Design a protein with these regions (language model features):
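Helix-coil boundary/capping segments in enzymes
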Residues: 1-205
Length: 205
């Protein structure tokens, strides 16, 4: 079995609030059970288990579930399209380098998809080129929109043209979904919100 949709994070993240001078970034808080709580400006976002950052724990899960190969990509909240482009690019490099390290250590078990600072097409293209040429990734993961821009926005075309020239696949992942404030119950974000966001992105293209 090949699992195309798996997310991974580095075991540690840079203190981006301190480094950039503003908030909105994900940080970790260690929990007593060995998990990590993802926190944004002091507010809990999600708790992740060791298999989210520990490749050996992930390999044990793969053996249990009969998965031969995983395609690794970052957790979409890390896209950071809202941030200043240089800072988003710096974070993308950290995330992509970590994925590349995991793939290099277990090249028969993992492939990687990079992340790009999509709010700045020139930077996104540079990072896309690095992902393909230096890190050896087959492609990248991008969000279903970029700060409200649908993926058919003309400003984004150069990124897709570069992906075509580089023979890079593009995995579109839903994020920052529509009508979030109306979907707090009944698993509606996953049953309705994410599929709707994906459909909107696909139809835009």
């Amino acid at each position: 079995m090949i699992d195309l949709h798996t997310h991974i994070l580095p075991p540690q993240l840079p203190d981006l609030r301190r480094l950039t001078g503003y908030g909105g970034w994900v940080s970790y808080e260690d929990e007593s059970n060995g998990c990590k709580r993802m926190v944004i400006d002091g507010k809990a976002f999600r708790t992740v288990e060791p298999n989210c950052w520990d490749a050996e724990a992930r390999l044990r899960d793969m053996a249990r579930d009969g998965v031969r190969l995983q395609v690794l990509s970052t957790v979409p909240v890390m896209f950071s399209y809202w941030a200043q482009p240089q800072h988003a690019h710096d974070l993308a490099r950290v995330l992509n380098d970590h994925i590349a390290e995991v793939v290099a250590a277990w090249p028969t078990r993992f492939l990687g998809l990079g992340t790009l600072p999509m709010q700045d097409p020139a930077r996104a293209i540079r990072e896309l080129e690095r992902c393909r040429r230096d890190l050896g990734f087959p492609g990248v993961q991008i969000g279903s929109h970029v700060n409200g821009q649908n993926l058919d926005d003309l400003a984004l075309y150069p990124i897709f043209e570069a992906a075509q020239e580089l023979d890079a696949c593009v995995f579109v992942h839903p994020w920052d979904m529509l009508a979030r404030d109306r979907m707090s119950r009944h698993w509606l974000p996953w049953l309705v919100g994410m599929p709707t966001e994906t459909a909107l992105a696909a139809c835009s293209l």
